[in-house]
From Swiss-Prot:
Homodimer. GO terms for molecular function: methenyltetrahydrofolate cyclohydrolase activity; methylenetetrahydrofolate dehydrogenase (NADP+) activity. One of its GO terms (biological process) is L-histidine biosynthetic process. The keyword NADP applies. GO terms for cellular component: cytosol. NADP(+) binds at residues 165-167, 190, 231. This is Bifunctional protein FolD 2. Signal peptide: none annotated. Gene3D superfamilies: Leucine Dehydrogenase, chain A, domain 1, NAD(P)-binding Rossmann-like Domain. The keyword Hydrolase applies. Belongs to the tetrahydrofolate dehydrogenase/cyclohydrolase family. Pfam families: THF_DHG_CYH, THF_DHG_CYH_C. Keywords: Amino-acid biosynthesis, Histidine biosynthesis, Hydrolase, Methionine biosynthesis, Multifunctional enzyme, NADP, One-carbon metabolism, Oxidoreductase, Purine biosynthesis.
Length: 283
């Protein structure tokens, strides 16, 4: 059996076309969604991610502002800049690119962003709303995964969903969204005793551990849907996910590639959250 490839680039393109229409409706009312992206330091991967986000904003008509600061910048300077953006009516969303330099607390910085402009969905207020089933902004990667599953017609009601990875950014919010969709959810972490056994139970397997090849084909139920959230570099420099694609694709019913799977959806949902923030501000 050869798994169907779940094309995140194609699904994200459809979402961007829909967002263009929503932006056009806002522009007709003299409103243009705006996103501020703050980058501290010179992490090469972060610079690539920021460029991709800015290009995506331009594609759908979102006004974006990128502010780059040296790694020597202090946390208080960053917090002051965030506070000033709260009062800017042209900015609907504020994104601080992670990771931050070691001398800065990501928690304090994220909590300094107004929940109304927290388009990453990381603020504790937005996490709490997600927990209660009434999200204001859904974290972009889990949101993108849900949209991918929806685009493939995957039924989650009653399905066994297993998540490998329990981070605040992906694993935990992913569990909340799957629960809301009616799935029975298991989260595996670094202390899970029988990862392979847990993974084999999954009708839908979502892998977000940050470790290349942590899941291979022997750990997958035949016909399962496999979503690979990981992004790593192989020893020869190639991008690869957390799933060993070659062996997994022989067993799974459908699988996301890396790159071209979840990544484009994460950016698309950032745009969606920014447009949503602009629409709310216009009410």
């Amino acid at each position: 059996m050869k798994a169907k490839v779940i094309d995140g680039s194609r699904a994200s393109a459809r979402i961007r076309e829909q967002l263009k229409e929503r932006v056009a409706c806002l522009r007709a009312r003299n409103i243009r969604p705006g996103l501020a992206v703050l980058l501290v330091g010179e992490d090469p991967a972060s610079q690539v991610y920021v460029r991709n986000k800015v290009a995506a904003c331009e594609q759908v008509g979102i006004h974006s502002v990128t502010e780059r600061y040296p790694s020597a910048w202090t946390e208080n300077q960053l917090l002051d800049r965030i506070a000033s953006l709260h009062g800017d009516p042209a900015i609907n969303g504020i994104l601080v690119q992670l990771p931050l330099p070691p001398h800065m607390s990501a928690h304090r910085v994220i909590e300094a962003i107004s929940p109304l402009k927290d388009v990453d969905g990381f603020h504790i207020s937005n996490a709490g709303l997600l927990m209660t089933g009434k999200p204001q902004f859904q974290p972009c990667t889990p949101y993108g995964v849900m949209k991918l599953l929806e685009s493939e017609g995957v039924s989650l009601r009653g399905a066994e969903a297993v998540i490998v990875g329990a981070s605040n950014i992906v694993g935990k919010p992913m569990a909340m969204l799957l629960l809301a969709a009616g799935a029975t959810v298991t989260i595996c972490n670094s202390k899970t005793r029988d990862l392979a056994g847990q993974a084999r139970r999954a009708d839908v397997l979502i892998v977000a551990a940050g470790r290349a090849g942590i899941v291979d084909g022997s750990m997958i139920k035949p016909g399962a849907v496999v979503i690979d959230v990981g992004i790593n570099r192989s020893p020869d420099g190639r991008l690869c996910g957390d799933v060993d694609y070659g062996s997994a694709a022989k067993v799974a019913g459908a699988i996301t590639p890396v790159p071209g799977g979840v990544g484009p959806m994460t950016i698309a949902m950032l745009l969606a959250n920014t447009v949503e923030a602009a629409e709310r501000s216009a009410i």
